[in-house]
Amino acid sequence: VADKVAAAKSVLLLVHGIIGDTDGIVEGLKLATDADGKSVDQKFDLVLTYDYENLSTPISETAVLLKKQLAAAGLHAEDDKRLTLIVHSMGGLVSRWFIEREAGNKVVDHLVMFGTPNVGSPFGKIDAARQLSGVLTTLAINTFPAIAPYGGALVYLLNRSKKISPTLEQMNPTSEFIQTLNASADPGIPYTIVAGDIRDYHESADQLMAKLIAKVGRGIVFDTLYQDAGHDIAVSDDSICGIANDRTPAPTKQNVICHHLNYFVSEAGLKAMAALF
């Protein structure tokens, strides 16, 4: 990896979330194309992925491990590379901790977050976590089989335990982790935030999701969690877009009509990603 990094000028790093791995993001890069047919991955000299244990290891520890692995690969404060991160869900919290608490702002040039719970998620509370993980796993089994085992493992863990996992606990809006992260100084690098909203969801190729929304998404579970606010099932749009606008540069924020698991396959998600590069 270090040899490839040494030969590259522009590097893209992908970081997954609480459910799934980076394979889905990689495929999304290839599907997101500009007017000339050039895909996002083709706009970088090198694409790297960071897969990590995402249930038991505290997010801050994962961020420190990320810093060490990047440095070992030749990505550090003194390098001559342009490093962009595309991250999903909890991967954004890992990346933000690295950038804002571990001097990663000297390494990263641009952070792009999809569905990141920047000020917390209902996943941080056991009852809500059980309900949401059940919905997401049902969706994954029927539409994204490759990531279904990750969701299944999460459901199994939550149903057998009276407590949530350490990483889910850190996503509670009142957790010390969330409070500390959002008290960080301005990192001084561009952040781009993409927030899914299922309220007007109509993806023609995703009939299962339409049925789920009709049965559950507009029912008592989500009404209790989000009231009338926009959300991508797992996270409210207010949380995804919860980074203050008084930073320099101010974070760029946009809403897309998709859910938490199809940012990288839905028409709206792919269009948003293609437009960023």
Task: Give the residues covered by each predicted segment.
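Structural motif
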Residues: 9-11, 82-84, 110
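Alpha/beta-hydrolase fold nucleophile elbow
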Residues: 77-88
